[in-house]
Amino acid sequence: MAAVNLRHIEIFHAVMTAGSLTEAAHLLHTSQPTVSRELARFEKVIGLKLFERVRGRLHPTVQGLRLFEEVQRSWYGLDRIVSAAESLREFRQGELSIACLPVFSQSFLPQLLQPFLARYPDVSLNIVPQESPLLEEWLSAQRHDLGLTETLHTPAGTERTELLSLDEVCVLPPGHPLAVKKVLTPDDFQGENYISLSRTDSYRQLLDQLFTEHQVKRRMIVETHSAASVCAMVRAGVGISVVNPLTALDYAASGLVVRRFSIAVPFTVSLIRPLHRPSSALVQAFSGHLQAGLPKLVTSLDAILSSATTA
């Protein structure tokens, strides 16, 4: 027996849906004789009489109606496949795995994700916070589609694009005497209650060295693991600190005072792409979204720092 092909199913579905050979031919953009010929061939191939022909009109048989029920189920499945393909082509569907430092998942990512997901509502994102150096190891192992780090080193098996570079900033509780200054110097921290990151943090080590070189002694009263925790404690009046500008910007809206530091301590955001993990249009779309959205944070930070009162 000859094989049934998709064209046979398409013609049968069109005839059942349209109710006549003429309308079916119109739906399929072909001629009525072609539809009639292929429908007869389909009946012969499957060995079933699908229609009764009465006075030039087609009437489905019981077998035809039952077969149409099965065709309908398959037809809807085919529609879903076509729709899914269109969605993937237009980035409307898909999954994206992003590994990043915890500071990024708590600062700029939430506000950048909202407009992206509004544009692609059927996309799902998996955000995996991780500290260095394990973060860079995961990216080298090609475990995620994209990575966001503060390192200036490119992990093995990846490519790195610098997205943003800003200086660390000083953070103070509302009403602190130093808040009247527009720029703080290392000497301003002499004898002040200071909230620091953990001893293993590279920025903690850099700042400790800087204050030592300037012979400034701070009162190291609290040590914590994250910049978000530092900012929360500063806002509550526990002490003052120097932190990354992104976390400071996030807390500025809730009362944290942010000031420039007289010494540049660069803080960099880098986008990491694994070289041996299959890329996709979705990866490219999100990368472009990050590159377009991050500069807006610079504008917001500059506005806050520029509004500081000069002593």
Curated annotation (Swiss-Prot):
Supply the PROSITE patterns for this chain: HTH_LYSR
List UniProt keywords, sorted A-Z: Activator, Cytoplasm, DNA-binding, Repressor, Transcription, Transcription regulation
Primary location class: cytoplasm
Signal sequence extent: none
Gene3D superfamilies under this entry?
A: 3.40.190.290, Winged helix-like DNA-binding domain superfamily/Winged helix DNA-binding domain
Q: Is Isomerase one of the keywords UniProt gives this record?
A: no
One annotated GO molecular function is:
DNA-binding transcription factor activity
Localized where? Cytoplasm
- HTH lysR-type domain ranges (all copies): 1-61
Q: Name one GO biological process term.
A: lysine biosynthetic process via diaminopimelate
Q: Which Pfam families match?
A: HTH_1, LysR_substrate
Q: Does Cytoplasm appear among the keywords? A: yes
Among PANTHER family, the record links this protein to:
TRANSCRIPTIONAL ACTIVATOR PROTEIN LYSR
Function noted in UniProt: This protein activates the transcription of the lysA gene encoding diaminopimelate decarboxylase. LysR is also a negative regulator of its own expression.
Protein's UniProt name = Transcriptional activator protein LysR
Organism, per UniProt? Answer: Escherichia coli (strain K12)
What gene makes this protein? lysR
